[in-house]
Design a protein with these regions (language model features):
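Thiamine diphosphate
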Residues: 107, 112-113, 308-310, 316-318, ...
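Flexible, glycine/charged-enriched surface loops at secondary-structure junctions
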Residues: 153-156, 334-347, 546
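Active-site diphosphate/adenylate-binding microenvironment
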Residues: 6-9, 14, 19, 32-36, ...
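Short glycine/proline- and acidic residue-enriched helix-loop micro-motifs
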Residues: 124-127, 178-179, 345-359, 495-496
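Short beta-strand segments
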Residues: 159, 380-382, 548
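N-terminal alpha/beta PP-like core and its mobile active-site loop of ThDP/TPP-dependent enzymes
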Residues: 1-332, 369, 378, 455-458, ...
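Short acidic loop-to-helix transition motifs that present clustered carboxylates
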Residues: 29, 50-55, 386-388, 526-530
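A general structural motif
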Residues: 2, 50, 109-110, 183-197, ...
Length: 573
């Protein structure tokens, strides 16, 4: 049966079970949008900018475990999703992104809105291709969905020239494809895993390090059972937070640059680091020569390229976290770690996350109230100080989830990602935790949130600064606050120490801004008003509510380890 490329495109999405697509139209994809108009099975979301669009798809994918799907036009439409592709690449988020392209005969002629988007994104996609023959379209789309969600998940880009969309001929959407050279890991090498487990049994001070791979493979329950059976304490990376309940007695906390004192000390003093689903990012290791100096290291990861790339390990195991843990559970036996846990409890008495209550609203207070008022929720953060406070203080269990930008650290990620998460989970509370800097990077998505009727609670921590950079300037750059004050004007004196009486009070006024979009806005300056603001936000299920928390400009995220230093060198006060 003859079928056009545009019809095959929509049929492919339906066959893959796609129920939502985030798309922004343009000249080279008008045919595809016209075909989407005719189907009732796919919800087409119109964002206000392509970067917002791809972050919304990330939020959708992270909150569901399904593939996020994007559709944008050629040229600037395509280049605007590059940051999101990189973000998804580093955080292993399954996306299939379709870009329009000029007709085949114009490729290479510098045609209007022609860019080589496949070439531009080759290093940040699992697979990228320009469709050259209409009869290949179905096979390529099938490959894209398979590649995006198998092995180490990630983004795939399919570039579809305009004439491929309109060409007609015989074609079917395949039920499966064989991809030469692509062999994702499904099993586990039992011999290597037994070596790793034998090492665990002989250790006196074992420690499990759980990364984002545990969450990606939905292996949190298996990890919880394993650590309980073995009686071994656990630390997590930021991306691994939530893999086990944060209130569990064997859970110590996040480790790394802004990790908990006890968690970092446990890494530094353990004699076996049993790592699962982490790539040993520099924010976790600090000085590689001083990382886990007394430990033998086991590394279980589905990505062969991650093994021994940053940290040379003693026992490598290439496997999905869930598959490895399932086998480990068959062997698990309780071991005596009482003395080791006593040492950890002594470190925990340092109370490196102590809360300040001596000067207005502290960020820690806000997180405490979020825990009380929004349990069992999806928490989405942007990037900056607020992100670290959230990862330090939010309590997570099996019914809650933390979504954040870890590998790329993308400011502007949080708000659109929360929209995508809410669209995917309309009945679940979604709390966006953001700052006055990051929120303004994709503030136009307020229109998307309002038109989609997403009742998101936006906790905006406003310190009038790019707070994380300001913190580095305070601690390491002699308090020279260069280009970090968000209220600074040309008339401000050189060497300005921060907002003063001559500065405009609000830039912008987030309450009025919310109202101008048809959303809700509340400003909170006292702790006693926090719960009332949350109660008001819960009433608004038809549109987002911005709760602007006015916090001190000089709040610091502590502990902190200077980049490149050993994780034992924590700044605590």
């Amino acid at each position: 049966m003859d079928i056009t490329g545009r019809k095959l495109f929509v049929k492919a999405l339906e066959e893959e079970g796609v129920d939502t697509i985030f798309g922004y139209p343009g000249g080279t994809v008008t045919d595809l949008f016209d075909e989407l108009y005719k189907t009732d099975s796919i919800n087409l979301i119109l964002p206000r900018h392509e970067q917002g669009l791809i972050h919304e798809a990330e939020g959708y994918a992270k909150s569901t475990g399904r593939v996020g799907v994007c559709l944008v036009t050629s040229g600037p439409g395509a280049t605007n999703i590059i940051t999101g592709l990189a973000d998804a690449h580093y955080d292993s988020i399954p996306l299939v992104c379709f870009t329009g392209q000029v007709p085949l005969g114009l490729i290479g002629n510098d045609a209007f809105q022609e860019v080589d988007i496949v070439g531009m994104t080759r290093s940040i996609t699992k697979y990228g291709v320009t469709v050259r023959r209409r009869e290949d379209l179905g096979k390529i789309i099938k490959m894209a969905f398979y590649i995006a969600q198998t092995g180490k998940p990630g983004p795939v880009l399919i570039d579809i020239p305009k004439d491929i969309q309109t060409a007609s001929g015989p074609a079917e959407y395949p039920s499966h494809v064989d991809i030469r050279g692509y062999k994702p890991i499904h099993g586990v090498h039992i011999g290597q895993l037994k070596k790793a487990y034998k090492m665990l049994k002989s250790a006196k001070k074992p420690l499990i390090l759980a990364g984002g791979g545990v969450n990606i493979s939905h292996a949190g329950e298996k990890l919880k059972k394993f650590m309980e059976k073995e009686n071994v304490p656990v630390v997590t990376t930021i991306m691994g937070k939530g893999a086990v309940p944060t209130t569990h007695p064997l859970y110590i906390g996040n480790c790394g640059m802004h990790g908990k004192y006890a968690a970092n000390m446990a890494v530094m003093e353990c004699d076996l680091l049993f790592s699962i689903g982490t790539r040993f990012n520099d924010r976790i290791t600090g000085d590689l020569n001083e990382f886990a100096p007394h430990a033998q290291i086991v590394h279980i990861d589905v990505d062969t390229a991650s093994i021994s790339r940053n940290v040379v390990v003693d026992v490598p195991v290439v496997a999905d976290a869930g598959v490895a843990l399932e086998k480990l559970l068959e062997w698990a036996e309780k071991k005596d770690t009482a003395k080791w846990q006593e040492q950890i409890h002594r470190w925990e008495k340092e109370n490196s996350l102590a809360m300040r209550r001596d000067r207005g609203i502290s960020p820690q207070m806000i997180m405490e109230h979020i825990n009380a008022q929004f349990p069992h929720s999806i928490y989405v953060t942007d990037v900056g100080q607020h992100q670290m406070w959230a990862t330090q203080y939010l309590e997570l269990d099996e019914q809650s989830q933390l979504i954040t930008s870890g590998g790329l650290g993308t400011m502007g990620f949080g708000f659109p990602a929360s929209i995508g998460a809410k669209i995917a989970n309309p009945k679940k509370p979604v709390v966006c935790i953001t700052g006055d800097g990051g929120f303004q990077m994709n503030i136009q998505e307020m229109a998307t949130a309002v038109t989609q009727g997403t009742g998101i609670t936006i906790c905006l921590l406003n310190n009038n600064y790019l707070g994380m950079v300001r913190q580095m300037q305070e601690l390491f750059y002699g308090k020279r606050y260069s280009a970090t004050c968000l209220r600074r004007r040309p008339s401000c004196p050189g060497g300005c120490k921060g907002p003063n009486d001559q500065c405009p009070e609000y830039v912008p006024d987030f309450v009025k801004l919310a109202e101008s979009y048809g959303a809700y806005g509340i400003r909170v300056e006292k702790e006693e008003d926090i719960d009332a603001a949350f109660a008001e936000a819960k009433k608004h299920t038809d549109a987002p509510t911005i709760i602007e928390f006015m916090i001190a400009t000089d709040e610091l995220v502590l502990p902190m380890v200077k980049s490149g230093n050993p994780m034992s060198e924590m700044i605590l006060k």
